[in-house]
Amino acid sequence: MATLLRGVLRPLYAFRGGPGPPAGVPFRAVSHGTGLLYPEHIPTSVLQKVLLAAGSAGMALYDPYRHDMVAVLGETTGRRTLKVLRDQMKRDPEGAQILQERPRISLSTLDMGKLRSLPEGSFGRAYLHFLDVNRVSPDTRAPTRFVDDEELAYVIQRYREIHDMLHALLGMPTNILGEIVVKWFEAVQTGLPMCVLSALFGPIRLSAQSLQLLISELIPWAVENGRRAPCVLNVYYERRWEQPLQALRQELGITEPPLRVEGLV
């Protein structure tokens, strides 16, 4: 029994939640007889995935800021949804190009000097402003490990790496309320189980005032925008830096948030 348990739990020991290879590394198949489908891939059985999903769900619900656990939950529960998202990308010219070229978003791939030189009001400057004000880095996104399909692994990696861009588009900060609003938008957009769980259970820690604002104004706004917008995975954001933020919002059908949520928890 002990030997069986060690075998089942081996991926848990292998997973440390730490940084993977630089995001500039191409997301391509690397098997060559190793059984690995892409960098950082950890092959897992169905039982191992069930255990990983259960454990990560519990930790993510207890502490929504455990991004490593949220990442594992997304990888172990979203295969069917990832296939739907992948097919949506393949049917869209811009999405298909992203799937083919596999761009990555990190400090090593972004030209920060160029972003700083862009005019105020551009999408690139808005994204840079979001990073600076909230003191976040694109390098903090966990690498995909437990998706046993190289193409689907890239889809969820891409979803993670554009998360901060969605914050900038939606005008949401990184406080608890802002993250929950973005998760509602992402849940409607992607249908990923971990987005749905985060959207439903994230508000547990909110104050009564923030919860009231969330339910009465912010959730309806996020749901409406999520339904109206085309698939956000089909936008080649790296080629939209110079586009005015308002023009990109209009293209995607994203309206201004009904209120500012900075300082609300």
Swiss-Prot record:
Its cofactor is Zn(2+). GO terms for biological process: ubiquinone biosynthetic process. Belongs to the COQ4 family. It is a peripheral membrane protein. One of its GO terms (molecular function) is 4-hydroxy-3-methoxy-5-polyprenylbenzoate decarboxylase activity. It comes from Bos taurus (Bovine). Keywords: Lyase, Membrane, Metal-binding, Mitochondrion, Mitochondrion inner membrane, Phosphoprotein, Transit peptide, Ubiquinone biosynthesis, Zinc. The modification Phosphoserine is found at residue 108. Pfam families: Coq4. Its EC number is 4.1.1.130. Lyase that catalyzes the C1-decarboxylation of 4-hydroxy-3-methoxy-5-(all-trans-decaprenyl)benzoic acid into 2-methoxy-6-(all-trans-decaprenyl)phenol during ubiquinone biosynthesis. Pathway: Cofactor biosynthesis; ubiquinone biosynthesis. Its main location: mitochondrion. It comes from the Eukaryota. Zn(2+) binds at residues 163-164, 167, 179. GO terms for cellular component: extrinsic component of mitochondrial inner membrane; mitochondrial inner membrane; mitochondrion. The lineage of its organism: Eukaryota, Metazoa, Chordata, Craniata, Vertebrata. This is Ubiquinone biosynthesis protein COQ4 homolog, mitochondrial. The keyword GTP-binding does not apply. Component of a multi-subunit COQ enzyme complex, composed of at least COQ3, COQ4, COQ5, COQ6, COQ7 and COQ9. Disulfide bonds: none annotated. The keyword Membrane applies.
